[in-house]
Every structure is written in structure tokens, then in C-alpha cells.
């Protein structure tokens, strides 16, 4: 269920459910490629495969984000592969996902991807989380505040 409550004049997005992350099948992200790493962090826990397509251009960002996402998903025990124009993430039992030292490749989106994984996988260590300063100068403080 998705709702948009307003608290103290600020509108929020609130999502509730049974904890199941549903795979998306083929999902075209042509118009929203920047969210691919964050979406990938969620889809690692999905019940069905997802092909994120229309994002081949992510190979030319701060790092080759498609290659980096595949490497890091595999590092935690997940299954992913590059597609000609995107990324496929296959479901695995969540108990097979494990701790790891996650590389950020000096890429702020990869750092947020890794920190999101740490919400569900214990003992994820993010190497160079400070790279998030590019878009969120106080990311670490905001993250710690959210978890407090």
C-alpha cells in the first residue's frame, strides 16, 4: 500500500506491505536511469527476476555502473548479469546473502546502493561512503539520524 501523508506541512511517501519485494519482469528505466542503483538494491530481495533496460548509458558515468552493480551484487551472494542495454537481477534465497566490504568505485550512487543493502544484510561495510558528498554533503549524518 502506498500513501502520501502530510506531517507538519511536509508530504511524505509511505509504503507498507507484507515484506515481499516483487520482481518487475522487464522494466524500462530509460527516463529514470539515475535510480537504477537504488532500485537494484531493493530488487536483490525480489521474488522474481527483473531486467532493468534502457540504461546502457550507465556504463559511462563516474564508473561503469552496470559492471559495478553486477560485481557488488555477486559479492554479497546475489545473482546478476549485464545485458546489452541494462541489468538482470535474479532472485536468491535471502539467507544466502551475506556480509561484505562493498566497493563504491568513487561513485555516489554506488555508495547509496551499498548502504541500502546494509539495511537488510548485517555487517555490510561501505568503502568510501564519503563519495556521497557529491549529491548529499551530509549523507552520513542524515543516514545515522534516520537509523537513530
Question: What feature does the model see in each segment?
Answer:
Residues 123-148:
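Structural signal for terminal/edge beta-strands and the immediately following C-terminal loop/tail
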Residues 36, 108-111:
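Conserved phosphate/oxyanion-binding catalytic-loop motifs
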Residues 26-30, 55-58, 100-103, 125-133:
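Short, recurring structural edge motifs at helix starts
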Residues 31-89:
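C-terminal structural cap/anchor segments
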Residues 1-31, 76-106, 119-121, 144-148:
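Self-splicing inteins and homing endonuclease
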Residues 45-52, 119-128:
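Short helix-capping/linker segments at secondary-structure and domain boundaries
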Residues 61, 89-90, 97-99, 110-113, ...:
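Short active-site-adjacent structural elements
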Amino acid at each position: 500500500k502506498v500513501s502520501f501523508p502530510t506531517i507538519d506541512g511536509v508530504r511524505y511517501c509511505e509504503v507498507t506491505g507484507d515484506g515481499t519485494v516483487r520482481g518487475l519482469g522487464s522494466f524500462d528505466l530509460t527516463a529514470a536511469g539515475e535510480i537504477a542503483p537504488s532500485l537494484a538494491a531493493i530488487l536483490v530481495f525480489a521474488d522474481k527476476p527483473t531486467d532493468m533496460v534502457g540504461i546502457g548509458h550507465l556504463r559511462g558515468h563516474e564508473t561503469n555502473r552496470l559492471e559495478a552493480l553486477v560485481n557488488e551484487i555477486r559479492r554479497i551472494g546475489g545473482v546478476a548479469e549485464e545485458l546489452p542495454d541494462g541489468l538482470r537481477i535474479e532472485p536468491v534465497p535471502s539467507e544466502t546473502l551475506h556480509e561484505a566490504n562493498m566497493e563504491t568505485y568513487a561513485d555516489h550512487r554506488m555508495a547509496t546502493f551499498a548502504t541500502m543493502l546494509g539495511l537488510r544484510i548485517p555487517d555490510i561495510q561501505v568503502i568510501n561512503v564519503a563519495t556521497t558528498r557529491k549529491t548529499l554533503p551530509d549523507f552520513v549524518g542524515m543516514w545515522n539520524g534516520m537509523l537513530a
